[in-house]
């Protein structure tokens, strides 16, 4: 079956939901999708389609990042629903890294919770530039002053992590009540229900406050591989989000990292199940590669314009080590510490060979909550550049976050 063409009419923005588990991130994602589908007369993604991760549903946890698309009058959005559970911070790092802006969901009934703080911190570290706040479950709060108190607390928390807490738009509402209304009447328009209107107000705030990103289209092409699969009779497809540049069918690219660098040609491009002539920075895309076996390519490699990025094992970085309260280590570490470095889409084991305090003074050990400059050496070479962000993880939890300040080897 020939695939329909993806039409590029409006500016495209990647956003996502972040916040504490059970504060209503997935319900809000479904409510936005349904509300805008009703207004634009298109088909929405249902809650259970968004939250679909069968292997983890048994434990009542959302894992996997679900991608939903929807449109406002002004823009086309790709929305990532980030997992809200601390065990899956790893996925949040891949998910949140794909956001031009985020909707922070906070239950008005509970106020900010530990993961609210953790997600704000992560958003800062993975470089999510802008945040809009949705105070959910407003129907459960009778006291207007309580709502104002929660807003104040969240604003202070945002300021603490260097977001402009005083300027960030806040919208209160109920994702569940809005979703129920749209489910009853799937052609409901703005002005017909107060809860549905609050979702429209939220998207007005997102439209206005989260700037259309200046895409890195002019830069050289780079995409980190998230997943790889074979299509019988057609070859191997690598999927991921184009970090920068433009890619066209017929272009030659390099596959860099983890193994010897190899070169291949692009034979096809797809997005949202539709074929494309070219993909550009910000697109979540599937790239069909000529003459590449599924076993030759894996998550964590990057596809790049030939000669523009090289694999490295040693670098210097500015790093923040999480406190115990933020879900980090409880004890200090010393040089020779061997954690995993989570870079773009993969974990690589490495050794922290030396470090100094952030002011350059000598340090014997690193305490939770410290900011340090450090040198690291990885066991496998991966595509690294100056200014690139990464997480430091051990035993499945994030213990630090950093940015590469210099490449050594």
Curated annotation (Swiss-Prot):
PROSITE patterns, sorted: G_TR_1, G_TR_2
Main location: plastid
Region named G1: 19-26
Entry GO terms, CC: chloroplast; cytosol
G4: annotated span: 136-139
Catalysed reactions, semicolon-separated: GTP + H2O = GDP + phosphate + H(+)
Residues covered by region (G5): 174-176
Entry keyword annotation includes Methyltransferase: no
Keywords tagged on the record: Chloroplast, Elongation factor, GTP-binding, Hydrolase, Magnesium, Metal-binding, Nucleotide-binding, Plastid, Protein biosynthesis
UniProt EC number: 3.6.5.3
Superkingdom of origin: Eukaryota
Record-linked Pfam families: GTP_EFTU, GTP_EFTU_D2, GTP_EFTU_D3
Residue positions binding Mg(2+): 26
Molecular-function GO terms, alphabetical: GTP binding; GTPase activity; translation elongation factor activity
Function: GTP hydrolase that promotes the GTP-dependent binding of aminoacyl-tRNA to the A-site of ribosomes during protein biosynthesis.
NCBIfam families, per database record: EF-Tu, PRK00049.1, PRK12735.1, PRK12736.1, small_GTP
Family classification: Belongs to the TRAFAC class translation factor GTPase superfamily. Classic translation factor GTPase family. EF-Tu/EF-1A subfamily.
The name this protein goes by in its record: Elongation factor Tu, chloroplastic
Organism, scientific name: Gracilaria tenuistipitata var. liui
